[in-house]
Amino acid sequence: MPLYVMIGRDGPDGIALRKRHREAHLANLQPLVDAGRVRFAGPIRTADGDPCGSVVVFEAANLAAAQVVAETDPYAVEGVFASVEVRETLQVFPKDTT
């Protein structure tokens, strides 16, 4: 299955909105985690250590399906993210053995 990277960049109220919607964001990703389709997920941080976005590397059937994952994420829906980008990627390291 193809691999995609979702990069969400927070808007000006990102920190406050993250706190409010974090549990829904994590719950939304959990089915993908349970299915073994998430390779990596976590916040992007500023030099001061504050979250300023998120990155999720995950498997999806195609770009359209990956975009649905990004567009329906609670951080996107609730305005945490000012922008969301989804691109197909290729895992080079560590070597994918699946």
Regions found by a protein language model. Give the residues of each.
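Conserved, structured core segments of small domains
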Residues: 1-98
